[in-house]
């Protein structure tokens, strides 16, 4: 029953990337999802470039959580940063580096992980389309901890 729910829920890029990450570095799936979440949210919102319709959804959630600010961009960023803070409060690593992923092994694997994530069926339901190069950039941000 849970599998039916997951297959109908549109899990998106975060799950596709977590599948690839867990397969390569043996990070438990829930932990991989948690680490990647703020970076995928930032990509989906378009925080580093032009804002997307997803940013407006994040801003609405931000308002509901009383994280308001003066703009859609800032509201979306507040939500993303709040997600990261909750991950840290759960004593989970907030970067791949903090999760113990070796830098050289990461560099060797990042391209293949991006390709695998792009091919993952979960990725097809992501609210923003992406390329392997964009996924690779998200993995790199998740490794270093770079958020806008």
Predicted regions and their residues:
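Glycine-rich phosphate/diphosphate-binding loops and the adjacent beta-loop-alpha structural elements
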Residues: 1-8, 19-22
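Gly/Pro-rich interdomain helix-loop hinge
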Residues: 24-108, 148
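Short, amphipathic C-terminal "tail helix"
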Residues: 105-148
């Amino acid at each position: 029953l849970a599998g039916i729910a997951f297959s109908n829920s549109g899990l998106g890029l975060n799950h596709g990337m977590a599948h690839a990450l867990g397969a390569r570095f043996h990070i438990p799936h829930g932990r991989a999802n948690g680490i990647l979440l703020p970076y995928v949210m930032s990509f989906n919102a378009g925080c580093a470039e032009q804002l997307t319709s997803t940013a407006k959804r994040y801003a609405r959630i931000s308002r509901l959580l009383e994280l308001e600010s003066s703009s859609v961009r800032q509201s979306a960023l507040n939500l993303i940063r709040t997600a990261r803070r909750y991950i840290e409060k759960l004593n989970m690593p907030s970067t791949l580096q903090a999760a113990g992923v070796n830098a050289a092994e990461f560099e060797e694997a990042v391209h293949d992980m991006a390709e695998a994530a792009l091919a993952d069926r979960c990725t097809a339901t992501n609210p923003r389309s992406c390329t392997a190069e964009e996924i690779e950039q998200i993995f790199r941000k998740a490794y270093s901890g770079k958020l806008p």
